[in-house]
């Protein structure tokens, strides 16, 4: 159904248009995408004719700053925070709307000799400013277009157009597949592009390592920072780094302040953390990776808001969704990079969560065995554990 990212990059380098599909839990739409440097009148006309949506030009922050392209509005209330700037035309265009003139304006954006006064405001080209960090920071078509351009070795700019059906509705994956076949286009997902970037780009930096005696034994603790969002993560390690080919006992644990520190009975996080450290110490070799992904990625305050909803009868999944979040926002790409830095290639993973296994394997790590980590249910977390089993697929038994 979808093509490898490498095939899409080859097509873009040849001046072809591709289709990029975003997450079904986001807009669930497809955009035509081309490199800005290959945005010929023919490409613009193709997008206008067969895409029918708004043609925009995603740009890196550097290009936007150089040309003094400011946000369209001071307070962005768009649900996806799409970063439109004021629309533009090149001053030498007439109406600015024809395929030829839109192509001319796009090419002028890439010209290093262009200055802000070369462009009229408003116009018929709609620049979008991509966030630094690209799809790893924001999983949108804007960032995907700029990431793809840079991966092609081209200037950080693209041209995109939402794809609509003939009846004016948004084209979803089944229709997009037919459109791709009809026009012989490569089609990729932003999800695959995110994975491609995690596998290709090192985004964590080892900052420090210390020896730490604990109630569970003496560990070597490695501190890391994430270059994209500045978050800090730590790995508690027993054994010699780098590890060899022999499977290593690993626990990837997401931060839970209420459970890990204060002994909350609403979850099983604290007991899981302690059990994992005990098992690693008993084996004398292993890694506990502590990721700062509080509340399955929604943050501490939002987790407390979710708890408030649970007091009103919501379960843990329903509470997240009521707050506008997915049930689980965690991403394991950064964790995989830290494990690779520690020389972990093959592991025995302490987890009840099959999605965690898939998440880590998707970044090139091998999991030879799943080691269950089920804790005894308590009065206040039994519903929580049953929901994780029934709705999130956790491998638990009651």
From Swiss-Prot:
Needed cofactors: Mg(2+); Mn(2+); Zn(2+)
EC number(s) reported in the record: 4.1.99.12, 3.5.4.25
Chain segments carrying region GTP cyclohydrolase II: 200-398
GO MF: 3,4-dihydroxy-2-butanone-4-phosphate synthase activity; GTP binding; GTP cyclohydrolase II activity; magnesium ion binding; manganese ion binding; zinc ion binding
Domain of life of the native organism: Bacteria
Residues holding GTP: 251-255, 272, 294-296, 316, 351, 356
Pathway, per record: Cofactor biosynthesis; riboflavin biosynthesis; 2-hydroxy-3-oxobutyl phosphate from D-ribulose 5-phosphate: step 1/1; Cofactor biosynthesis; riboflavin biosynthesis; 5-amino-6-(D-ribitylamino)uracil from GTP: step 1/4
Annotated residues for binding of Mg(2+) 2: 27, 141
Gene3D superfamilies to which the protein is assigned, alphabetical: DHBP synthase, GTP cyclohydrolase II
Catalytic activity from the UniProt record: D-ribulose 5-phosphate = (2S)-2-hydroxy-3-oxobutyl phosphate + formate + H(+); GTP + 4 H2O = 2,5-diamino-6-hydroxy-4-(5-phosphoribosylamino)-pyrimidine + formate + 2 phosphate + 3 H(+)
GO CC terms, sorted: cytosol
Binding site for Zn(2+): 256, 267, 269
Cofactor annotation remark: Binds 2 divalent metal cations per subunit. Magnesium or manganese.
Residues holding Mg(2+) 1: 27
Residues covered by region (DHBP synthase): 1-199
One GO-annotated biological process of the protein: riboflavin biosynthetic process
Record site feature (Essential for DHBP synthase activity), residues: 124, 162
Residues at the active site: 328, 330
Binding-site residues, D-ribulose 5-phosphate: 26-27, 31, 138-142, 162
HAMAP family given in the database record: RibA, RibB, RibBA
Function in brief: Catalyzes the conversion of D-ribulose 5-phosphate to formate and 3,4-dihydroxy-2-butanone 4-phosphate. Catalyzes the conversion of GTP to 2,5-diamino-6-ribosylamino-4(3H)-pyrimidinone 5'-phosphate (DARP), formate and pyrophosphate.
Record-stated family: In the N-terminal section; belongs to the DHBP synthase family. In the C-terminal section; belongs to the GTP cyclohydrolase II family.
Name by which UniProt lists this protein: Riboflavin biosynthesis protein RibBA
Source species of the chain: Bacillus subtilis (strain 168)
Primary gene name: ribBA
């Amino acid at each position: 159904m979808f093509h490898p990212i490498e095939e899409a990059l080859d097509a873009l380098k040849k001046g072809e248009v591709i289709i990029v599909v975003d997450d079904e839990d986001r807009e669930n739409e497809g955009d035509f995408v081309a490199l800005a440097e290959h945005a010929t009148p023919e490409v613009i006309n193709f997008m206008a004719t067969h895409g029918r949506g708004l043609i925009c030009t995603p740009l890196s922050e550097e290009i936007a700053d150089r040309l003094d392209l400011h946000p369209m509005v001071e307070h962005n209330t768009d649900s996806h925070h799409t970063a439109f700037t004021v629309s533009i035309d090149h001053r030498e265009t007439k109406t600015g709307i024809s395929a030829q003139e839109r192509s001319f304006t796009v090419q002028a954006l890439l010209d290093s000799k262009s200055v802000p006064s070369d462009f009229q405001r408003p116009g018929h080209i709609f620049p979008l400013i991509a966030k630094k960090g690209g799809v790893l920071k924001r999983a949108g078509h804007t960032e995907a277009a700029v990431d793809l351009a840079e991966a092609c070795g081209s200037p950080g700019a693209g041209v995109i157009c939402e794809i609509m059906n003939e009846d004016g509705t948004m084209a979803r994956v089944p229709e997009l597949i037919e459109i791709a076949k009809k026009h012989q286009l490569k089609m990729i997902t932003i999800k695959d592009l995110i994975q491609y970037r995690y596998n290709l780009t090192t985004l964590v930096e080892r900052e420090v390592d210390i020896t730490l005696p604990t109630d569970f034994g003496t560990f070597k603790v490695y501190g890391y920072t994430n270059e994209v969002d500045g978050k800090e993560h730590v790995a508690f390690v027993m054994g010699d780094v780098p590890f060899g080919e022999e499977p290593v006992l690993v626990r990837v644990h997401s931060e839970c302040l209420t459970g890990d520190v204060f002994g909350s009975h609403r979850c099983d996080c604290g007991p899981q953390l302690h059990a994992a450290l005990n098992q690693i110490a008993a084996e004398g070799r292993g890694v506990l990776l502590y990721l700062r992904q509080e509340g399955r990625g929604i943050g501490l305050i939002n987790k407390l808001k979710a708890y408030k909803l649970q007091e009103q009868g919501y379960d843990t999944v329903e509470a997240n969704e009521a707050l506008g979040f997915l049930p689980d926002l965690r991403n394991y790409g950064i964790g995989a990079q830290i494990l690779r830095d520690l020389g972990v290639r093959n592991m025995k993973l302490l987890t009840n969560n099959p999605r965690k296994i898939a998440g880590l394997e998707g970044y090139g790590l091998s999991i030879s065995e799943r080691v269950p980590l089920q804790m005894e249910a308590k009065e206040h977390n039994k519903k929580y554990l049953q929901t994780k089993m029934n709705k999130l697929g956790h491998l638990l038994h009651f």
